[in-house]
Structures are given as structure tokens and as C-alpha cells.
Curated annotation (Swiss-Prot):
InterPro entries assigned: UPF0060 (IPR003844)
Record-stated family: Belongs to the UPF0060 family.
Annotated transmembrane regions: 3-23, 33-53, 62-82, 87-107
Location, primary (coarse class): membrane
Species the sequence originates in: Myxococcus xanthus (strain DK1622)
Protein name, UniProt field: UPF0060 membrane protein MXAN_4406
Amino acid sequence: MNLLYAFGLFVLTAVAEVVGCYLPYLWLRQGKSPLLLVPAAGSLAVFAWLLTLHPTGAARTYAAYGGVYIAVALVWLWLVEGERPTTWDLVGALVAILGMAIIVLGPRR
């Protein structure tokens, strides 16, 4: 699988998960409509489906995906929630992305 394609798929997967978790947060913590649970469930279903599109084992896919998820969550924090990530947030995301790259690019038997 093309590395750029895989990374893009990880990003889409992370966005689907963040949306699926953020909408219930809005309902539970900010008093928004419980109807937000409907698109949240749909988003989480898309998230699970996107994970199946990766060609490697589920556990390895999910482990590598974690690094991208961290970076996407920080972008979400900045763009949607209006809170700029700290230097330490960015360093942590970089370490996570490096970990993801090691998992994805590492040699296989």
C-alpha cells in the first residue's frame, strides 16, 4: 500500500473517531441536543469500517493509527475548540508520528 495513501486513510479514520467522540461530549458536557448521538454513531461506524481498509493485521493497524490519532486530535483542538497546542503537545505528537512510522515502515518477516 502506498505510504501516502495509508497516511491519508489514517487521517480520515482519526477524523471519524474524533467526530464520533466529540458529538457525545457536546451533549454530555455542553448541554447540546441528544440528537447528536445519531451522527456520532454513524461516524464511529465509519471509523470502524475505515480501519478494515488497511491491509495489515488489525492490531498493527490500530497501533500505528494511534500516532496519527494524537496528531489529528491536536489539530482538532486548535481548529474546532480554539485552543492552540503547546510546544509539548507538538513534541508529543511528533514522537507519536515517529512511532507510527516505525511500525508502518519496519521490516516484516
